[in-house]
Amino acid sequence: AVVLAACSPKGAAGGDAACGLSDDDFRTEGILQAIPVRATFLDEVSWDIPHQNWGVREWDADFRAMKNMGINTVVLIRAGLGRWIAAPFECLLESEEVYYPPVDLVEMFLTLADKYGMAFYFGMYDSGKYWQEGLFQREIDLNLKLIDEVWARYGHHESFQGWYLSQEISRRTKNM
């Protein structure tokens, strides 16, 4: 990290040595004793994430790196968004206009979470329409079907610990 020091313009031209200051002069005593990061999100397929370029080798390296830095929990931020889904979920393929995914990322993520002894939480599907249109029950019903399907297909994984509710509400959300 670079620390900006107040130096005269003349001294600043010579760099830190001219100021007689270094980053160490400003470091806090507990710099390496912050609250550890133990969990992270996995962004599955959507929006602006170039996930399609990663295969199991890249994901394995990522999970290994996460484990090595102390992460013990991964959360699939959502099962899909709009037309993009993280696995071939039959309930979504039958009822929504979604693309058939080329890879079962959920199986891959759970297998890697098992391998590295991590807890895995599954995020819900975001249709990109029902929630925004105020059709909350439709989004909920869709996800209830998804939960049943996901548990039947993936519930045997030791790492599978539960669910993450990705839909958000605020004080501005009407008719909730």
Predicted feature descriptions by range:
Residues 13-18:
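Ser/Thr-rich, Pro/Gly/Ala-heavy low-complexity intrinsically disordered linkers and tails
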Residues 19-72, 77:
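Boundary/entry segment of secreted carbohydrate-active catalytic domains
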Residues 33-38, 70-72, 116-120, 156-161:
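Short, well-ordered coil/turn segments that N-cap beta-strands
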Residues 56-68, 72-127, 176:
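Aromatic-lined substrate-binding rim segments of carbohydrate-active enzymes
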Residues 125-131, 146-175:
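Active-site groove signature of glycoside hydrolases
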